[in-house]
């Protein structure tokens, strides 16, 4: 113990994803940003299984049941006190600076832990969306969830560099 020296714990950022990252090139990209994030936060990736829906044209009730089960698993993976940031199509489109401000506000409030959530190909349950402190969308384009994971990981890193005053963001 050293008198007069204050240490601050790094925030914990969890990336909770439904489904696996199969493509090597996406996995390598995510791993690179995960490594870079170590200077700013403890960063953990949690992969949860996607509920199988057998019918090609499944009813809304079947999809809702699968989403609800995935949602319970997602919420069960969120650390106590962490803010949930849900990536969803109906979410708000935000800039890198706005994400940085959200993370800075969380850290300044003393509650810097954040759980970023990417649902399955069917989306997220209403329960997860209601629990989210922030719901955001990467835009109106459609992209594979594996690519979304890479882009989100890069944006988390970018937000951290913005908050640190680094030159990465232009």
Where are these regions (language model features)?
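A mid-sequence interfacial segment
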Residues: 99-139
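General small-molecule cofactor/ligand-binding pocket signal
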Residues: 16, 44-46
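Single conserved hydrophobic/aromatic residue that forms the stacking wall/gate
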Residues: 1-9
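Structured adenosyl-cofactor binding patch, chiefly the S-adenosyl-L-methionine
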Residues: 122, 126-170
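Short glycine-rich anion-binding loops that position phosphate/pyrophosphate groups of nucleotides
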Residues: 21, 89-92, 120-123
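N-terminal beta1-alpha1 ligand-phosphate binding loop
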Residues: 11-37
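Short, well-ordered alpha-helix to beta-strand connector turns
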Residues: 41, 81-82, 132
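S-adenosyl-L-methionine/SAH cofactor-binding core of RNA-modifying enzymes
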Residues: 49-114
